[in-house]
Amino acid sequence: GDLVHCDFGITYLTLNTDCQELAYVLKPNETKAPKYLEDALIEGNEVQDIMTGLFEKGKTGNEILSETLRIGKEKGYKPQIYTHPLGTYGHSAGTTIGMWDSQGGVPFNGDFPMNYNTVYAIELNTKVFIEEWNKEIRVMLEEAGTFEETGFRYVNGRQTKLILIGDQRVHLGN
């Protein structure tokens, strides 16, 4: 079995999406992904929860970045955050929360405060050591989310299970 990462975006009516999800290619006779990969995805989801739980009107992207990294590391994770606004281009105007090459803060865009009624690509990864493969992998996730007065929510939900490739039962509806 292999772990597959897909990063894609769609532009429609001048608005952009940005999404990353993970899939697992089943070995012959497998019907589900190995537990160690399911657990790795759970760690990625927990990092998402840490970060989005820190969203607060007026808090800057750099403050959210710093707190997310601190809390994530305290919990034993190896997070990397690079969340950005979505809009009429992929990395749109507004509050930026980290960049892949700027985990100590983002000058200017990271200093913008969070505002309600804004949409973000919740983009991040966490590194997880997989004993069975004797290597570290990055659980890379990205989903659209909106920050409103009622709090944060994912626009269309988020990935919480690996997509299974080669599972004919799912494909055929059995």
Language model features by range: what are they?
Residues 2-174:
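Active-site neighborhoods and metal-handling regions in enzymes and metal-associated proteins
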